């Protein structure tokens, strides 16, 4: 049962519905493999061990797996872990189920639903050994930054579901979003940045700092840096962990001249 004392943060969706047609092969995978590997959304807590046929292996959550190539590769590489992967788009769900069938992966389960509601309703506090969020929509335009997934309220929800000592791994190919992630996550008291490097903020300026009138509003939840953050050095990024393969999004970003930033945090004990 969900802890009623938990404060539900202002609604932010983990996804945007996009057009895309499910192929016959993807639909076949959903029909044939869905009953075994696709977990329906429910309003009560999921028994993670039961969901993986009694497995007591560490449980890793992935939010937004796209077409599932990276998820499948990581699950195959890390056979000693179980992976619960969330995606809303049927073509991606079908594509990953198809790979599961072709490669006989047994340590992977999928949920097709909004990740925020899955975290709130289905996953118990202190139940996860790790969380992966790779290449979430950066919402490039400044007026859309409020739609970005990595905001303080959502991060608190993530941290609450991690076990003490568990990790949170994010990656993005958009520098400004990387810096927002960094500032939001570094400010979360329940997390420790595992990076040894120190960096300065480059993509935000004084014009982005929240005004006193904005801060005074109870409804103001959008991330904006403080002047102190812009003037300080911060614990930074890490090298891409070996278990995360280079994705098509990463290659696309590199071709466009973008960098790729990995952030890894550990929940404090």
Regions found by a protein language model. Give the residues of each.
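SAM cofactor-binding core of SAM-dependent methyltransferases
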Residues: 58-117
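Conserved class I S-adenosyl-L-methionine
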Residues: 144, 171-188
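A short acidic, Gly/Pro-enriched loop at the edge of an enzyme's catalytic core
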Residues: 120-130
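Class I S-adenosyl-L-methionine
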Residues: 183, 188-269
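Conserved beta-strand signature within the Rossmann-like core of class I S-adenosyl-L-methionine
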Residues: 164-172
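A short SAM/SAH-binding and catalytic strip from SAM-dependent methyltransferases
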Residues: 128-148
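S-adenosyl-L-methionine
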Residues: 1-61, 69-72, 76
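A short glycine-rich, Lys/Arg-flanked "PGG" loop and its adjoining helix->strand segment in the class I
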Residues: 150-164
